[in-house]
Amino acid sequence: MTMDKSELVQKAKLAEQAERYDDMAAAMKAVTEQGHELSNEERNLLSVAYKNVVGARRSSWRVISSIEQKTERNEKKQQMGKEYREKIEAELQDICNDVLQLLDKYLIPNATQPESKVFYLKMKGDYFRYLSEVASGDNKQTTVSNSQQAYQEAFEISKKEMQPTHPIRLGLALNFSVFYYEILNSPEKACSLAKTAFDEAIAELDTLNEESYKDSTLIMQLLRDNLTLWTSENQGDEGDAGEGEN
């Protein structure tokens, strides 16, 4: 029995309430594959679903990688760790490739508004960034380059078409700066991007509308937290907090 769009969306909302994000992602993938442009609500449901699905694997991957490094003296334990990490990596790669396929085949081509285009290109940058975190060799170079390209394209559209206080523009600046810091190891570029985004938003705080006030100020806070962390790390204080991202 094929479900119509409203039933699938309802199923995704139920799955979100139950914190069953794999089900939520499957429902929103089916909505996307129907080929219509997504509403803002549908777009957010899709994004939340996959962010949780991939987030669980990213977190598991970090834990296992760290355990693997600590068991260097015990070959058997290390081998087990390696195999388990590779299993998680394969899951993570499948999820990212799923999302990237939806973006390239349906979401980006169907986006009629600049806001949606920026949202989906940011998402493309994010999922290539997640792939690059677990990639090596040529594969790493390709994923890093694809991520940067998507972020850059989104960044240019956002500067031309959106207010500096728009939560999607701010969220993009946040994640693009994390990309520079973590993936390209360019702290100066990361700080400059985050600081510019923060300062431009502060200068236009009066353009904030009611709806997005909470989202925008939260992301501005994350930009500021990252700037504080990165500045202290570069002055030699080893901060251990993870970067905030959107």
Swiss-Prot record:
Concerning SUPFAM superfamilies, the annotation shows: 14-3-3 protein
Its main subcellular localisation, reduced to a broad class, is: cytoplasm
Q: How is it modified after translation?
A: The alpha, brain-specific form differs from the beta form in being phosphorylated. Phosphorylated on Ser-60 by protein kinase C delta type catalytic subunit in a sphingosine-dependent fashion.
Gene3D superfamilies given in the database record: 14-3-3 domain (1.20.190.20)
- Where in this protein does the record say N-acetylmethionine is found? 1
Task: Name positions with the PTM N-acetylthreonine.
Answer: 2
Q: Which is a Pfam family this sequence falls into?
A: 14-3-3
Keyword Endoplasmic reticulum: yes or no? no
Gene Ontology biological-process entries:
negative regulation of G protein-coupled receptor signaling pathway; protein localization; protein targeting; signal transduction
Q: Where in the cell is it found?
A: Cytoplasm; Melanosome
Modified positions (Phosphoserine) in chain numbering: 60, 186, 232
> Which residues are reported to carry the modification Phosphothreonine?
2
Crosslinked positions (Glycyl lysine isopeptide (Lys-Gly) (interchain with G-Cter in SUMO2)): 51
Q: Which UniProt keywords apply?
A: Acetylation, Cytoplasm, Isopeptide bond, Nitration, Phosphoprotein, Ubl conjugation
Among the entry's GO cellular component annotations, what is one?
Answer: perinuclear region of cytoplasm
Give the highest taxon in the source lineage.
Eukaryota
Q: Kindly list the GO molecular function terms attached to this UniProt entry.
A: protein domain specific binding; protein kinase inhibitor activity
**Residues marked Interaction with phosphoserine on interacting protein (site):** 58, 129
In this UniProt entry, the residues modified to N6-acetyllysine are: 5, 51, 70, 117
Q: Which residues carry this modification: 3'-nitrotyrosine?
A: 84, 106
Please describe the quaternary structure of this protein.
Answer: Homodimer. Interacts with SAMSN1 and PRKCE. Interacts with AKAP13. Interacts with SSH1 and TORC2/CRTC2. Interacts with ABL1; the interaction results in cytoplasmic location of ABL1 and inhibition of cABL-mediated apoptosis. Interacts with ROR2 (dimer); the interaction results in phosphorylation of YWHAB on tyrosine residues. Interacts with GAB2. Interacts with YAP1 (phosphorylated form). Interacts with the phosphorylated (by AKT1) form of SRPK2. Interacts with PKA-phosphorylated AANAT. Interacts with MYO1C. Interacts with SIRT2. Interacts with the 'Thr-369' phosphorylated form of DAPK2.
Role summary: Adapter protein implicated in the regulation of a large spectrum of both general and specialized signaling pathways. Binds to a large number of partners, usually by recognition of a phosphoserine or phosphothreonine motif. Binding generally results in the modulation of the activity of the binding partner. Negative regulator of osteogenesis. Blocks the nuclear translocation of the phosphorylated form (by AKT1) of SRPK2 and antagonizes its stimulatory effect on cyclin D1 expression resulting in blockage of neuronal apoptosis elicited by SRPK2.
- Return the PANTHER family for the record: 14-3-3 PROTEIN (PTHR18860)
Q: Name the protein family.
A: Belongs to the 14-3-3 family.
The name under which this protein is listed is 14-3-3 protein beta/alpha
**The organism of origin for this protein:** Bos taurus (Bovine)
